[in-house]
Amino acid sequence: MRNRHRQCTTSIKKNIGFTECSLNKVKKNLIKNANIDNIFFNKGKVEDTLNNKKNLPKKISILRLDTDFYESTKIELKNLFSRLVKGGIMIIDDYGFWKGARKAVDDYFGDYRQFFHYVDHSCRLLIKK
């Protein structure tokens, strides 16, 4: 597992930090561990899909943010955090790694600090109260 993570990290750095992945590949990866019938997929750029209210689910139980940049993370929070149910989990994949993601989260919550659980050097987890 460690070696695979190291290879992935090396690959990411080599590719300027970002990879593209088809929706089909995402579904194939998820189907190994989850029933994808209960997962809402929305293909497209964050700026396009999340600013269109018809694309948004009414309630979210698990919200995973993994877009790295300030603007996309800000849009995710603005449009999705209010839909996260009480007791729901938000995972911020790149809080400790990408400055844009961290700044967007810090700006969004401002003085109203949530408790972010430290998962590892990059990931933080929040349980909505």
Mark where each language-model region is:
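S-adenosylmethionine/decaboxylated-SAM
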Residues: M1-K129
